[in-house]
A protein has these predicted regions:
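HhH-family (HhH-GPD) DNA N-glycosylase catalytic core used in base-excision repair
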Residues: 1-169
Length: 169
């Protein structure tokens, strides 16, 4: 039903229709649902276009992604400071911010087969920028969480607020 009604919030309605019943499963977080289902749906066969659309709209916010948004000052700029957890998925939280950013980026410039708006791609790019398995730049292994980042070689340095993750003791 949610898929049949057009409108700018169509994908959000489809996600909600799919995820809300699954949130009743005790111990399964939004992050786990988004991560698992997005991988499954993005890998759907070509004739399952709606599955791929919904999978591409699912944003999995882990601590690396949340902490990146905090350290760079993005959460503060959106007046969305909050601790990591369920607030990341509330209106105005990390997932909404990434969705907003994704609407400003044409993902087809990276791969012509991508949809123009691809929130999962933006979230994954942030994760890869931070993760040890990726570029290993913006994370607790490289930055003392009690201090501001001092990596002047970082491509984001001049636009980054370089906020501490924790107050210095």
């Amino acid at each position: 039903m949610a898929a049949r009604q057009a409108g700018p919030d169509r994908l959000a309605r489809m996600r909600t229709a799919l995820l809300d019943p699954l949130k009743e499963v005790h111990g399964v977080s939004d992050k786990v649902l988004m991560m698992t289902l997005s991988i499954l749906f993005l890998g759907a066969p070509g004739q399952r276009r709606r599955w791929r659309e919904v999978g591409g709209s699912m944003i999995a916010v882990d601590t690396l992604v949340h902490n990146f948004l905090h350290r760079t000052g993005i959460l503060a700029r959106f007046r969305a400071d909050h601790p990591y957890g369920v607030a990341c998925y509330r209106p105005g939280g990390c997932a909404d911010i990434i969705e907003t950013v994704a609407q400003q980026i044409d993902a087809r410039q990276f791969n012509r087969r991508f949809p123009a708006t691809f929130p999962r791609f933006v979230q994954h790019a942030i994760w890869r920028y931070c993760s040890q398995q990726g570029l290993d730049i913006c994370n607790g292994n490289q930055i003392d969480d009690r201090k501001r980042c001092d990596n002047k070689q970082c491509t984001l340095y001049s636009n980054c607020d370089r906020k501490r993750l924790h107050e210095a003791e």
